[in-house]
Amino acid sequence: MSSIEWRVSEGLTDYEYARSEMTKRVADIANQEASEMLWFLQHPPLYTAGSSADRRELLMPDRFPVYPAERGGRYTYHGPGQRIGYLMMDIRKHGNDIRRFVHSIEKWVIESLAEFGVTAYSHPERIGIWVDTPDGEAKIGAIGIRVRRWISFHGFSLNICPDLEHFSGIIPCGISEFGVTSLHALGKKVSMSDVDQALADRFPYFLEALQSKEAF
């Protein structure tokens, strides 16, 4: 863990700046000129379009800035009250299995949520982190990873206390039949730093899972 830099940015981080920083860091890691990094931050309100985004799923194109993202997936929302975790890691050093890497991120976030009494789960047909609510299944976290020269970038988002109405400008991840929720909406009034600590506590288990040979 000591070889992986942890960076936590206060306030709101411009998306274009974050993308530029990730691109540079990925190149530096690939060239063995920088350490791996986990970057926790928040963005101002915006939508991002993954490589599979369908323009028809952008319901309010003028509501917030829309940025193309180099990750997989479709449209998603980022904004204040949402913890973004960008992972710039050399997958060759951590199991050399991209599929396992993605599923291990899901497991890491799910186990971190359990520390707040939230039972979350992944779904075999819908990527992301899900919970059951009185209104049915709802998404509380999203996963979107890109890999370049075996170095990961982008990562996950976890809804702590964002304005959930902001998701109405898109069909999140192309899934219209399920809603979105947050820790606060579930009655868990935790802070951003509480969530960061839970993720840090579970991070060694995430690294162990990357090396596991167990099937998903």
Curated annotation (Swiss-Prot):
Entry EC number(s): 2.3.1.181
Subcellular location: Cytoplasm
GO molecular function terms listed in the Swiss-Prot or TrEMBL record: lipoyl(octanoyl) transferase activity
Protein species of origin: Zymomonas mobilis subsp. mobilis (strain ATCC 31821 / ZM4 / CP4)
Domain BPL/LPL catalytic: 32-211
Known function: Catalyzes the transfer of endogenously produced octanoic acid from octanoyl-acyl-carrier-protein onto the lipoyl domains of lipoate-dependent enzymes. Lipoyl-ACP can also act as a substrate although octanoyl-ACP is likely to be the physiological substrate.
HAMAP family according to UniProt: LipB (MF_00013)
Source species taxonomy: Bacteria, Pseudomonadati, Pseudomonadota, Alphaproteobacteria, Sphingomonadales
Keyword Coiled coil: no
GO cellular component: cytoplasm
Record: residues binding substrate: 71-78, 142-144, 155-157
Site description Lowers pKa of active site Cys, residues in chain: 139
Name of protein: Octanoyltransferase
Record field: catalytic activity: octanoyl-[ACP] + L-lysyl-[protein] = N(6)-octanoyl-L-lysyl-[protein] + holo-[ACP] + H(+)
Catalytic residues, chain numbering: 173
Enzyme class per UniProt: transferase
Keywords: Acyltransferase, Cytoplasm, Transferase
Domain of life per record: Bacteria
PROSITE patterns in the record: BPL_LPL_CATALYTIC, LIPB
UniProt xrefs under SUPFAM superfamilies: Class II aaRS and biotin synthetases
A Pfam match: LplA-B_cat
Recorded family membership: Belongs to the LipB family.
